[in-house]
């Protein structure tokens, strides 16, 4: 009797695993992220710490590994050393014997013009020879600067089922926020009918006047189709060599098979039933996304055993809380406190502390994000602040109560969040000479 082969559909795990193994992920991690102000003075945005122990890029890398996409290139450019060091320390567990790898792709002026990466499309174009060496069937292009959990196997399966040339992950957002992204329109089959990068007046979704459909900067390309389009774009003098500004609008206008994938169909374990995706590109957004993690049931579940967020694990002792006097009690309430922290007769409320933070007696920290290796002296009172790593907060410093006074020394956002860095305190830990 002849055995019939298994039917390969997008519900078949074998079908999806074959797709993920035949996919190369390329993470664009070379951006500065200027809206994060001083947090990116000495590191690229994907290397900015997040969530108590992670870096922003860990979420995209974890999505790749958890989805079964384990051939990964990371494209770097702006002040990449912190990012490179983190990936080398925390992401060396992939096994090359099974064709698993993370390959760092720094800007090397690989074109005949001898230029650095000029745009997102150019960053991929300059690595075409490396992509061809790995010979993937599909290329998954990702940003390294957003916080979300996504099963990339689902967008890959949908891409193949629709016989698409390009599939773009999309999300509904309030129309007033859409001008910071690529804005799309689709037909009933979710084929993309228009695409505008960061329009001044975003078009709302038909029937939903308060919302717009935006690109998440997540693209699935058929590999050979991608190579052809990048070569064509490179030869266009008028192009800025960017996917959102040039390549995608041109593909939509030429009637290529460009489809949209709804993020809610691949978002992993939504706590509130609403897909979680955060662009932490401003100090306000960064502060809020971190503080949200201290709530009882945050929208982003970091305790999900089925979809762990991988990172470099420092060898640190547990957090310690000392002194229990009425006026000097070491305690943290509604907060996240990481390894190596010592709360010595101080009070922490609704705050997130990264590793190795030391807070001395009679100090109070409220609604704040404290990055690693910060020391806070006695009688300090910090409220609604982000403190950069390595800061030495002096005795008696009070921040967060008088914005006009705070602005004389620190950066204060429109929403009243204060950013404190060592340089602002006169502690020059970053220097060239």
Curated annotation (Swiss-Prot):
Alphabetical UniProt keywords: ATP-binding, Carbohydrate metabolism, Glycogen biosynthesis, Glycogen metabolism, Nucleotide-binding, Nucleotidyltransferase, Transferase
The keyword Secreted is assigned to this record: no
Reaction(s) catalysed by this chain's protein: alpha-D-glucose 1-phosphate + ATP + H(+) = ADP-alpha-D-glucose + diphosphate
SUPFAM superfamilies attached to this UniProt entry: Nucleotide-diphospho-sugar transferases, Trimeric LpxA-like enzymes
InterPro entries: ADP-Glc_PPase (IPR011831), ADP_Glu_pyroP_CS (IPR005836), GlgC_bac (IPR023049), GlmU/GlgC-like_hexapep (IPR056818), NTP_transferase_dom (IPR005835), Nucleotide-diphossugar_trans (IPR029044), Trimer_LpxA-like_sf (IPR011004)
Protein name in UniProt: Glucose-1-phosphate adenylyltransferase
Annotated family: Belongs to the bacterial/plant glucose-1-phosphate adenylyltransferase family.
A single GO BP: glycogen biosynthetic process
GO molecular function: ATP binding; glucose-1-phosphate adenylyltransferase activity
Enzyme class: transferase
Free-text function comment from the UniProt entry: Involved in the biosynthesis of ADP-glucose, a building block required for the elongation reactions to produce glycogen. Catalyzes the reaction between ATP and alpha-D-glucose 1-phosphate (G1P) to produce pyrophosphate and ADP-Glc.
EC number: 2.7.7.27
Subunit text: Homotetramer.
Transmembrane segments: none
Chain sites annotated for binding alpha-D-glucose 1-phosphate: 117, 182, 197-198, 215
Entry superkingdom: Bacteria
Pfam family, one: Hexapep_GlmU
Pathway info: Glycan biosynthesis; glycogen biosynthesis
